[in-house]
UniProtKB/Swiss-Prot annotation:
One MF term in the entry's GO annotations: glycine dehydrogenase (decarboxylating) activity
GO cellular component, one term: glycine cleavage complex
Protein name: Probable glycine dehydrogenase (decarboxylating) subunit 2
A Pfam family that the UniProt record links to this protein: GcvP2_C
N6-(pyridoxal phosphate)lysine sites (modified residues): K262
InterPro entries, per database record: GcvPB, GDC-P_C, GDC-P_N, GDC_P, PyrdxlP-dep_Trfase, PyrdxlP-dep_Trfase_major, PyrdxlP-dep_Trfase_small
Family assignment from sequence similarity: Belongs to the GcvP family. C-terminal subunit subfamily.
Biological process (GO), any one: glycine decarboxylation via glycine cleavage system
Class in the EC hierarchy, top level: oxidoreductase
Length: 486
């Protein structure tokens, strides 16, 4: 039931104070001709409605949220208070630069810290998400080669284990995407070598990759890429594994995008809010989006790079997210960020060892911050799919891992526990998953019809994709909901 369904005419949650200024009639042309369609509810109705929704929801503040490649770590509440300081909360982006010096200083110093962490020379903070950062990076790649009149470079090479946004971002800029095979979970260097030629603009990589494995041949990959005149692009989705240990810039990457909402602990989920800064080496600095923040003497200024790709976001990006990330980095410090990566890798390896007793883990040895298990054998013997396992996990009050990704692992479960989970939490999660796998063999129908205890049972995903309901349409019967759309 929506808040609109609880509306009763004349019911109010507030009283408007008496007017203390003269009445001024509003011109008819500015007046609404129809009543504003807002719910009429009391304050208890509002509080109870949203409290009920919160109780039905799941978040990292409720329990472990081990979505692979999402880094759903606990977010310190101090960062929220920092972002809510009046000096940050009450500014307007159209104020004169002279009155925004505190905000500009924060952005300038955040850029410097992120450049130090990644080994880049400059950075834009404008992109609003990881995929937005990828798009920005690909626009920089295109502008770089266009500026050099090297117009035949139309290809971008992407591993078969890459995030789906990698080929999507390259395609949006007009590049042809070529898939590179994996060998033992890592880039097949020989296959890469075959595809590198003077038509390749960039190679996009994640390191550690989406299997949680560190690309040991990264220096060779960088050498081959640069020898053919192409750029090496770093998808920073998995930076949480290597902070303080190795810098993407030292591996040979020319462009980096980060996810502040993942690695640097700003709350995210359900589409935002996010931030996807893009860092570049010196030869690409002139192509960054504008405005860029620079320091001139004692003042901070908004500047336009010489060969800029233009704006990619209004104003300064998602500024409150930048404040939270800045607060997090200062709070953790250099040693703290290194400890974050150490604990993320330790937790992933601990959980991997426990889960490997009852699920196949395709790639042996140590993983980095995440790992991928496969329920292929479970499916062959019981008919229970990874999706069924994920749905059943919900009945135990915890969130399932990412499923069916990366695509090169059949019936994949991609698990990233992050550094903020305790040993006890990891033990409980492994016990739950083991119990679910045991149920798959003893009573597979329990899993095939799961979840059984959640407010919303298994949805009809085919119908949801063919007749989606994107927004509220007014009061209508439950039986008519699937007929509503946008």
């Amino acid at each position: 039931m929506t808040i609109f369904d609880k509306s009763k005419r004349g019911r109010r949650a507030f009283t408007i104070p008496e007017r203390d200024v003269p009445e001024y009639p509003l011109s008819e042309r500015f007046s609404r001709r129809t009543p504003l369609k807002l719910p009429e509810v009391s304050e208890p109705d509002v509080v109870r409605h949203y409290t009920e929704l919160a109780r039905k929801n799941y978040a990292v503040d409720v329990g472990i949220y081990p979505l692979g490649s999402c880094t759903m770590k606990y977010n310190p509440k101090l960062n929220e208070r920092t972002a809510n300081l009046p000096g940050f909360r009450n500014v307007h982006p159209l104020q004169p630069e002279e009155t925004l010096q505190g905000c500009l200083q924060l952005m300038y110093e955040l850029k410097a810290m992120l450049c130090e962490i990644t080994g880049m020379d400059d950075m834009t903070l404008q992109p609003a998400a990881g995929a937005h950062g990828e798009l920005t990076g690909m626009l920089i790649v295109k502008k770089f080669f266009d500026d050099r009149k090297d117009t035949k470079r139309k290809k971008v090479l992407v591993p078969d284990s890459a995030h789906g946004t990698n080929p999507a971002s390259a395609s949006m800029v007009g590049f042809e995407v070529v898939e590179i095979k994996s060998k033992n979970g890592m880039v097949d260097v020989e296959d890469l070598r075959k595809h590198l030629d003077d038509e390749v603009a960039a190679v996009m990589l994640t390191n550690p990759n989406t299997l949680g494995l560190f690309e040991r041949d990264i220096l060779k990959i960088a050498e081959l890429t640069h020898n053919c005149g192409a750029l090496l692009y770093y998808d920073g989705a998995n930076l949480n594994a290597i902070m303080g240990k190795v810098k993407p810039g030292d591996m040979g990457f020319d462009i980096v995008h980060l996810n502040l909402h993942k690695t640097f602990s700003t709350p995210h989920g359900m589409g935002g809010p996010g931030s996807g800064p893009v860092g570049v080496k010196r030869h690409l600095v002139d192509f960054l989006p504008f405005p860029n923040v620079e320091k001139e003497g004692n003042l901070y200024r908004l500047t336009v790079p010489k060969k800029t790709i233009g704006r990619v976001r209004s104003f300064f990006g998602n500024f409150p997210v930048l404040v939270k990330a800045y607060s997090y980095i200062l709070m953790m410090g250099r040693d703290g960020l290194e400890k974050v990566s150490e604990m993320a890798v330790l937790n992933a390896n601990y959980l991997k060892k426990k889960i490997s007793r009852f699920l196949k883990v395709p790639y042996d040895g140590f993983c980095m911050h995440e790992f991928v298990a496969s329920a292929e054998e479970v499916f062959k013997k019981t008919g229970v799919r990874t999706l069924d396992i994920a749905k059943r996990i919900l009945d135990y009050g915890v969130h399932p891992p990412t499923v069916y990704f990366p695509l090169i692992v059949p019936e994949a479960l991609m698990i990233e526990p992050t550094e903020t989970e305790s040993k006890e939490t990891l033990d409980r999660y492994a016990e739950i998953l083991e119990k679910v796998i045991k149920e798959a063999f003893e009573n597979p129908d329990v899993l095939k019809n799961a979840p059984h205890r959640t407010p919303v049972r298994r949805v009809n995903e085919v119908l949801a994709s063919r007749k989606p309901v994107f927004r509220w349409r007014g009061k209508y019967e439950a039986g008519d909901r699937n007929q509503q759309g946008t």
